[in-house]
């Protein structure tokens, strides 16, 4: 039986640099292939070649789809063939309805007039196919990210998709939303729709894939049956070396208490009747990594936003640093108290995409380079930028390159470099490795470990329970704004954390000092 897709000996160059070097990929109808590799490995370039974003003639090699050679000059050419790609940054128009998004550019008309009745009927069938129980008239901006992802799939199905490409589809989804999405993909597989799945979450890759294709430095390293590969096998192929331990296995010597929060309560910015954080108290020691776990809506991010002075609503409670009560109502006051934060959404809150890498690093510490006068000491700033880039191993062709052009992992390292310029005593990391590859994760985990060895106290909020458990000395478990458990991490399991989150009564254990 012929393959649905064959990409033969694809090479794509930018100037003298080969982004893709003689890569081949093939899959059958109804097959799920995961494409794995570090950021910058060439995955996105290969998919842009396949989809016609890089047109025929701009690359070497051959693409055969459904028995015919594709020579696409535009993404619409491949869409007509039945190839659809859903990017991590969803391409929906938030102000339009679900129906309007699904039929955007593919409206059903009769005599030049749109047939809304027929489109509504078709839309309802598409939504049912992706298990979405919503009205076609719902505004997309009112949907959660998981629902928006399913609308994107419904939009692809409306184009008679035969090959669906999903690029980091679960990066911003909850575990429940992820489970729903994977079930939808399996259902599509039963209907003969093939899928190329791109994700840094190797547990998902293992769960969903028939085969796994690994690319490193623009070259095809290997394609194997998923059933015969472990996560360690995938990592070794991706990074070219064996990572014996993803999380640093070094004991932390904790010091005195540096932070204590008492009876923190925060209200919804608009609806004062809703408590997003409800009477939460906890402490933090020097040289300790404190993980905060919980489902989406648990109040984790809201808690640390209050601590950093950026929660947009009202809140009350007491914050003590070194035993002294402090008042923190904005980020400047937090920084003055020795607190720095890497935000949850780095693209929205962490970087200025069009600004240079170096300027992003020094953005919060420009007073270091003024010497009490208004004029900036450019030489001192450049020296500091180069040292930070070297220390954090930020991969960039130049400090003057716009940071938006870097991979997610290198953007995150630049934000960490900015935080370290503030000489923090308390470092808050909200989703520190979201959307970055395994190699960059490993480097960030090593850096976190080095910081706590220096006595810096670290708070880690993560939706990935293995990350929380792999890093933390102690884990706070939150649910619906309340602190449900305070657990010493002596071989804690994911099941124990989830049980603590979902049990009805409080279960706050005493800390061992």
Curated annotation (Swiss-Prot):
Domain ABC transporter: 5-242, 259-505
Keyword terms of this UniProt record: ATP-binding, Cell inner membrane, Cell membrane, Membrane, Nucleotide-binding, Repeat, Sugar transport, Translocase, Transport
Source taxon at top rank: Bacteria
Membrane topology: Peripheral membrane protein
Keyword ATP-binding: yes
SMART domains linked to this entry: AAA (SM00382)
Binding site for ATP: 37-44
GO cellular component: plasma membrane
Keyword Transmembrane helix (UniProt): no
Catalytic activity: D-xylose(out) + ATP + H2O = D-xylose(in) + ADP + phosphate + H(+)
Description of how the protein assembles with itself and partners: The complex is composed of two ATP-binding proteins (XylG), two transmembrane proteins (XylH) and a solute-binding protein (XylF).
Protein task: Part of the ABC transporter complex XylFGH involved in xylose import. Responsible for energy coupling to the transport system.
Name this polypeptide is given: Xylose import ATP-binding protein XylG
Naturally occurring in which organism (per UniProt): Escherichia coli O157:H7
């Amino acid at each position: 039986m012929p393959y649905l897709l064959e990409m033969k000996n694809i090479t794509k160059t930018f100037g003298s640099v080969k982004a893709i070097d003689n890569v081949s990929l093939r899959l059958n109808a109804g097959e799920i292939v995961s494409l794995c590799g570090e950021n910058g490995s060439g995955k996105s370039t290969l998919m842009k070649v396949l989809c016609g974003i890089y047109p025929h003639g701009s690359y070497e090699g051959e693409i055969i789809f459904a028995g015919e050679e594709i020579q696409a000059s535009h993404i619409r050419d491949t869409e007509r063939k039945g190839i659809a790609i859903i990017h991590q940054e969803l391409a929906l128009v938030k102000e339009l309805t679900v129906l309007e998004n699904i039929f955007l550019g593919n409206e059903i008309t009769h005599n030049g007039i749109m047939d809304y009745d027929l489109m509504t009927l078709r839309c309802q069938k598409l939504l049912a196919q992706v298990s979405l129980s919503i009205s076609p008239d719902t505004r997309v901006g009112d949907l959660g990210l998981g629902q928006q992802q399913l609308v994107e799939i419904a939009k692809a199905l409306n184009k008679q998709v035969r090959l669906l490409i999903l690029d980091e589809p679960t990066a911003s989804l909850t575990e429940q939303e992820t489970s729903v999405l994977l079930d939808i993909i399996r259902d599509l597989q039963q209907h003969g729709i093939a899928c190329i799945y791109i994700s840094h979450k190797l547990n998902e890759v293992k769960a969903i894939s028939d085969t796994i294709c690994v690319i490193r430095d623009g070259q095809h390293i290997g394609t194997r049956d998923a059933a015969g590969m472990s996560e360690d096998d995938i990592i070794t192929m991706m990074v070219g070396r064996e990572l014996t331990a993803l999380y640093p296995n070094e004991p932390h010597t904790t010091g005195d208490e540096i932070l204590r929060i008492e009876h923190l309560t925060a209200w919804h910015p608009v609806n004062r009747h809703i408590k997003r954080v409800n009477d939460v108290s906890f402490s933090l020691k020097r040289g300790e990594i404190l993980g905060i776990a919980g489902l989406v809506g648990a109040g984790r991010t809201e808690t640390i936003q209050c601590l950093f002075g950026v929660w947009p609503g009202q809140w009350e409670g007491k914050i003590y640093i070194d035993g002294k009560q402090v008042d923190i109502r904005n980020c400047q006051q937090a920084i003055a108290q020795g607190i720095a934060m890497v935000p949850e959404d780095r693209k929205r809150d962490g970087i200025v995409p069009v600004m240079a890498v170096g300027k992003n690093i020094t953005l919060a510490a420009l007073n270091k380079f003024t010497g009490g006068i208004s004029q900036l000491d450019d030489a001192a700033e450049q020296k500091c930028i180069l040292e930070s880039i070297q220390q954090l191993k930020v991969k960039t062709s130049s400090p003057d390159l716009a940071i938006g052009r870097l991979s997610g992992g290198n953007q995150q390292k630049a934000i960490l470099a900015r935080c370290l310029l503030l000489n923090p005593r308390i470092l808050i990391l909200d989703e520190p490795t979201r959307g970055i590859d395994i190699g960059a994760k490993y480097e960030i985990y090593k850096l976190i470990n080095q910081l706590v060895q220096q006595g810096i106290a670290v708070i880690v909020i993560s939706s990935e329970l293995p990350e929380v458990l792999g890093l933390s000395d102690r884990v706070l478990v939150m649910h619906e704004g309340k602190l449900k458990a305070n657990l010493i991490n002596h071989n804690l399991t994911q099941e124990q954390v989830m049980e603590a989150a979902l049990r009805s009564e409080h279960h706050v254990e005493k800390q061992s000092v």
